[in-house]
Amino acid sequence: MKRTFQPKNLKRKRTHGFRARMRTQGGRAIINRRRAKGRKRLTA
């Protein structure tokens, strides 16, 4: 049976990367929450 997760770095960056997050208001909110929490890595 084929697994559902077939990792691809480009797709990962495009979907969950910093620039993708900054593109939308909700994405910027995610980054701000993660900054407030003190996350070492903000995005994928």
From Swiss-Prot:
Domain of life: Bacteria
MF-aspect GO terms: structural constituent of ribosome
Protein's name according to its UniProt entry: Large ribosomal subunit protein bL34
HAMAP family tied to this protein: Ribosomal_bL34
Record family assignment: Belongs to the bacterial ribosomal protein bL34 family.
Gene3D superfamilies in alphabetical order: 1.10.287.3980
One of the record's GO cellular component terms: ribonucleoprotein complex
Any GO BP annotation: translation
Keywords from the UniProt entry: Ribonucleoprotein, Ribosomal protein
InterPro entries xrefs: Ribosomal_bL34, Ribosomal_bL34_CS
